[in-house]
């Protein structure tokens, strides 16, 4: 069972698609670096919808898998 996505992962999933459409030849490592920098520059108020979605996913995950324990 996969862990639920955090706010950054929710946001980056959307943004990664946009970057890949604009620059299909860009390497994944470069995309990840850019996403990390852009997330850090994003205002806290702009992060709120993604934080809320991550929380919703976390609660759903807890309901769907009540005995789940993260094991790396």
Curated annotation (Swiss-Prot):
It comes from the Eukaryota. SMART domains: HMG. InterPro entries: HMG_box_dom, HMG_box_dom_sf, SRY-related_HMG-box_TF-like. Keywords: DNA-binding, Nucleus. Residues 1-69 bind DNA. GO terms for molecular function: DNA-binding transcription activator activity, RNA polymerase II-specific; RNA polymerase II cis-regulatory region sequence-specific DNA binding. One of its GO terms (biological process) is neuron differentiation. One of its GO terms (cellular component) is nucleus. It is found in: Nucleus. It holds the Pfam family HMG_box. PANTHER family: SOX TRANSCRIPTION FACTOR, TRANSCRIPTION FACTOR SOX-4. This is SRY-related protein AES4.
